[in-house]
Amino acid sequence: RIDHYFGQVFEEMFGGGKGQLILEDPENPLTCGIEIRVQPPGKQVKTITLLSGGEKAFVATALYFAILKVRPTPFCLLDEIDAALDDRNVDRFAGYLHNLKKTQFIVITHRRGTMEAADVLYGVTMQEQGVSKLLRLDLNQMEEYLGIGE
């Protein structure tokens, strides 16, 4: 089932292409390795080892999201999962989070595209040496206040 969802999530996140998980020894699925083969749009089929760092991170994220489709969790913490992604893939990643409605995400990020897709932002700032302050910004309330909501 994870392979099915991986192909689906891969295609949605990459805007096309194909993703596939292949058991190295189908006779022993619990002890064998898994080969990840992908074909990003407009490219040839590759194993994950031949991808760039950003592509590897995006494929790993697609795999994680496929697992969440099979086994949803109520809560998920992602720490700078978007750090190696280019701006286009940051936007795709952030947009895809909204497809996983059964899971609440806390995403630690420095990327603007991810922040823009959030419902609520929390920030930590230090206004004076050694004293941290927590900031909270509810983007939906802010849009209503400014009259710029959908």
Question: How would you describe each model-predicted region?
Answer:
Residues 1-150:
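Terminal ABC-like ATPase head and other globular end-domains that cap long coiled-coil arms
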